Amino acid sequence: MPNFIDYTKYYGEKSFEEVPFNDIDALILAELSYLNFSDVSDELPNTIENISKSYFYVVTKEKIKSKKNVYKYAHNLFGYVKTSPRFKDIEMINYSRIVDSKKQFGAITFKYNDWIYISYEGTNEYMSGWREDFDLSNTFPVPSQKLAAEYLIGEAKKHNKIYVGGHSKGGNLAVAAAMQADEKVRKKIITVYDFDGPGVREKEFNSDQFQTLIPKIKKFTPEVSVIGMILYSTPNYTVVKSDYKGILQHHAMSWQCFGSYFIPAKQSKSSIKFNKSIKDFLKDNTEEELRNFVKAIFEVLQKSDITSTETVTIKKIIKCVNYVRQLNTYDPKTKDKLLKLFNIVLALYTNK
């Protein structure tokens, strides 16, 4: 079935004046934020077409072979949009990339005529980004969310029509940035695009900052959603048909579209069950308990060689369960919670 690559072929000849900016355009620009433009950032601002020449000279097919699928997909996508009349003249400006032991942050702004799209990068291969994803359950804002807000506020000083968006953690950063912005900046935001990103804690969900933002949030998840079902998000989300199975549906490359629209679908029963289980699971814990619990999860994942959604397999989840069972370093309460959590994930992965 057609995906966003097919969209670039069908609509690549159409200008934004002929076919207005839409949800699939937003996903395409969100996916491009996964690419590392550090080696060509001194050429910004510049058009997609011009930057692509330098980018593909530096980042060869050989270099991308060892990368995770999300980078390969984005690399392939960039190859399609670089000469597309619809995308090639979009300006790329203000590339930011910060990675250290405590945070992972990436953002780039795309500008076309009088509007901009701020694209936040999702979780990459660095462990600091993976760790931040877990910290969302006990902290707000995490370091990357603070950086996302600063980035948005900086761009809002220069532009008046703003879209913000991202895939996975990038979707969460888009929402978090808008939440932290003042009313003057919020008025400039047209839409906040959240493509299967984790939500926020119940405390932030119930805040005025989030509730008043809901009308501007457009969230999309696949039928089987794990990342996008974590914590609390806008209740008005769209489920998209995917041609991948299980947790791999998180890859937006698998999301099906028809024309300039995503093909709608129904949330899987396993995703609904997972969402409820995680919320129930988090309710009865203090912030300190959650911090310690996240630390324990992270240790188990590392011991089981799980560093991203792409490295998750049934064998590795079972390895997590067995590892926890054999441990004597955690108190009984933490050990019990770890077992419940990994069994929930195992049930989701096996669609039981």
Q: Residues of each region from the PLM?
A:
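Short glycine-enriched nucleophile-adjacent loop
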Residues: 174-183
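Gly/Ala-rich beta-loop-alpha elbow adjacent to hydrolase catalytic centers
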Residues: 166-170, 174
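Alpha/beta hydrolase fold serine-hydrolase catalytic domain that processes acyl esters and thioesters
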Residues: 1-24, 29-108, 112-116, 120-161, ...
